[in-house]
Amino acid sequence: MITKNYLIDKIHDKLNYLSKEDVKDSVDLILDYLNESLKQQKRIEIRNFGNFSIRKRKFPESEKFYNTVYYRMPKNLFKE
């Protein structure tokens, strides 16, 4: 499983000229922006990774709806 700390460590390994704190701040900033965009029901498209959007779903046996995150992966994600 990839956690936020794992992601920070891997980015820091590749970009060792940045401090770990700078990498952490950058990852936090990106995740916060993605989170806020989804809260505002904006569609997120990251080329060669996938699309994220909000979909409304209905509770079973109820007239109430809830929001869920929908992910669509690109067709070439697992192609070699």
Curated annotation (Swiss-Prot):
InterPro entries: Hist_DNA-bd, IHF-like_DNA-bd_dom_sf. It comes from the Bacteria. GO terms for cellular component: cytosol. Keywords: DNA condensation, DNA-binding. GO terms for molecular function: DNA binding; structural constituent of chromatin. The keyword DNA-binding applies. One of its GO terms (biological process) is chromosome condensation. Histone-like DNA-binding protein which is capable of wrapping DNA to stabilize it, and thus to prevent its denaturation under extreme environmental conditions. Belongs to the bacterial histone-like protein family. This is DNA-binding protein HU-like.
